[in-house]
Every structure is written in structure tokens, then in C-alpha cells.
């Protein structure tokens, strides 16, 4: 069961997946699924009734996550704008390769790109299109929260993230301090 909403000029050019019968202007064949239609309507009403509460909760989780990460990890920037979905945040961890950080925290499910590009190892094309340079994009991680995400899971993710970013930066000789600029211990220069 689903719904199709769009510009009539585009919809009129669509072809049905299954032909036969003339339901829904020829786009759907067969007898209408009455119980599916009723269920879809009930689901839509449930979303309408709960959406504000869900969005408020997701915003609270995301803000708590970002506030704690920023408090505990130096050199963190939010790549997004204020006006965005409430359940997702993309953060740049200066001096910490995103893939290395993700590998160092196997119990936390995150991505270095958009959901549709999760298997692509290159920096996020979305971040590049936003004007973020390739280095910053390759050090950026996308965090998403859902309806079943608990406060305990968020706090555990923060702990693992703090450890993982610190570990990756230490391996790379990057030392950051809260409230200060980046200091890089370049082994090649000291040799």
C-alpha cells in the first residue's frame, strides 16, 4: 500500500507496473485493497498525531549528543545548517580520518556519507557540494538517531566516539586541546 503525490503533468506520463483495469487513472490494476487503504489512513493519522513529539525528541537527542561531543572532544565542527532534519547530524573531527574512527568504534553504527552512499569510501559528495574541502569531508561522520534510540545508547556512543577520535588522532600524531588551535606532531620534520 502506498500513495503517489506529484505534479499531474509528470504523473500522466507514468506507466503502470501491472496492467489491467482502469483504477487510479490506469496506474493501478485490480480490485482496490480496502483494508490496506484503511491501514494506510490510520498510519498517516498516527504520524500526524505523533510527528511533533517525535521531532522534539530527536532534536533533544541530537542537541545532547552534539553538546557532549563538543564538550569532550576538541576540534569538532557541525557541517550542517540549523535548518535540517532533527534526527541527523554530520560532524567534522579535525585531524581524525572518518574511516579510521568508524573502524575504532565497531559497536556504533555511523556513516561517512549519505545513507545512499554508505558503501562508497570516498568523501561525501554532499559535503563537497556544500563547499567543504576534501580533507574536512574525509574527517566527517554522519550520526542518525531513531525512534527506538535510547539515552543510554547515545551516551555509550559518545564514550566510544571520544575514545576512537582520541585513538586515531594519537596514532596520527595530532594533539588537540579544548579551546586551542590544532598542534601537529609531524614525525617527518623531526627526523
Please report, for each region that a protein language model flagged, where it lies by residue.
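Active-site PLP attachment segment
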Residues: 1-25, 29-42
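Short loop segments at secondary-structure junctions
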Residues: 7-11, 94-96, 148
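A general structural signal for well-ordered alpha-helical segments in protein cores
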Residues: 11, 34-37, 44, 62, ...
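Thr-Gly-centered strand-to-loop micro-motif
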Residues: 14, 27, 111-114, 144
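A short linear hydrophobic-aromatic micro-motif
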Residues: 74-79, 110-114
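Conserved C-terminal alpha-helix-loop-beta "cap" of PLP-dependent enzymes
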Residues: 88-142
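PLP-dependent enzyme catalytic core of the Aspartate aminotransferase-like
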Residues: 124-191
Amino acid at each position: 500500500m502506498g500513495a503517489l503525490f506529484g505534479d499531474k503533468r509528470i504523473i500522466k506520463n507514468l506507466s503502470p507496473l501491472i496492467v489491467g483495469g482502469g483504477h487510479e487513472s490506469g496506474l493501478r490494476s485490480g480490485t482496490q485493497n480496502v483494508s490496506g487503504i484503511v491501514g494506510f489512513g490510520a498510519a498517516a493519522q498516527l504520524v500526524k498525531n505523533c510527528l511533533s513529539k517525535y521531532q522534539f525528541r530527536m532534536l533533544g537527542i541530537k542537541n545532547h549528543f552534539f553538546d557532549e561531543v563538543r564538550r569532550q572532544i576538541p576540534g569538532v565542527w557541525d557541517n550542517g545548517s540549523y535548518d535540517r532534519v532533527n534526527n541527523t547530524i554530520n560532524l567534522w573531527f579535525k585531524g581524525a580520518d572518518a574511516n579510521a574512527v568508524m573502524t575504532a568504534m565497531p559497536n556504533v553504527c555511523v556513516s561517512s556519507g549519505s545513507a545512499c552512499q554508505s558503501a562508497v569510501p570516498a568523501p561525501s559528495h554532499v559535503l563537497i557540494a556544500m563547499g567543504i574541502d576534501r580533507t574536512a569531508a574525509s574527517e566527517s561522520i554522519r550520526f542518525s538517531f531513531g525512534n527506538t534510540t535510547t539515552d543510554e545508547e547515545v551516551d555509550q556512543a559518545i564514550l566510544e566516539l571520544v575514545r576512537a577520535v582520541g585513538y586515531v588522532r594519537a596514532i596520527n600524531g595530532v594533539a588537540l586541546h579544548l579551546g586551542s588551535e590544532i598542534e601537529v606532531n609531524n614525525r617527518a620534520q623531526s627526523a
